[in-house]
Amino acid sequence: FNILFKKEYSNEKEYLLIKINSDSSKILKYEIKLPISSKIIDFITFDNLIIFSSSNKKRENLLNIYNIRNKRFMNLYASLKINEKVIGIKKINETIFEVIVLSEELDKSNLLSKRRFDLNGNEINKIQVSIKNRSLISGNFYTINSNKIVGIGLYGKKNSNDAIGIYISSFLDNKLEYLKKYNFFELPNFYKNDEKYLKTNILKKIKNKDFDKIKFDHNFIPNELIKIDNNLVFSAESILLNYNNNNNYTYIPYYNTYAGTYDK
């Protein structure tokens, strides 16, 4: 496994990469000196390369390749537009890596894409998914076989980071086969849809499938959606609005994720 450290007072230009081989207990150290200040967000390593997503002081999102042997630095300018950011990066094999990119469109909707590159930074292929009048908040793509890929993630209203449902997309030979979306209220037992927990007007909207008209007194913030074997594991937290602070509202989490208890 690999560990990356940022050198103190280096203006985010100097890092230390430690590669640990668990089989041989061999530890290798490499000093990384970047030509520009870059806050490294996520990274993967190959034999002589470290490939990482980063952001600079102008808040531009970058995708970079750095050779730890000859210190050569490559910024893949053509791979990202100003409205795009990398939210995931992984190694496919010894010659190919993959990034998941979230793009904000002019109409304030978001789309998600999966892009594969060779080690020279050349884009090999790309697939993307979007939902009309909706924003994709997060997601990932899973290879089923040599020609089938499934994309799964969370979506919300346009220009919103609050998830309102889950989407499932299927690609055959890199072409969209189908796209389905499900509001959380359509999922069995996601919410307790009875009068003990929900107001009558909300239950009526659920019955009529007027999901976009439902308004809660809390925000619903997704944390992660991951695939484990044949199951999807979803974690999130709710933030309750409090209007009892001099007519100004503050956010109060009613579930403390650190203590594992509900706040009073």
Task: For every predicted segment, state its role.
Residues 89, 111-115, 171, 176-190, ...:
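Karyopherin-beta/Importin-beta family HEAT-repeat alpha-solenoid scaffold
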Residues 32-34, 78-81, 128-133, 178-215, ...:
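Surface-exposed loop and turn segments in beta-propeller and other repeat-based domains
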Residues 1-10, 42-57, 64, 94-107, ...:
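Short beta-strand elements that form the blades of beta-propeller/WD-repeat-like
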Residues 27, 73-76, 121-129:
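Blade-edge beta-strand/turn elements of extracellular beta-propeller
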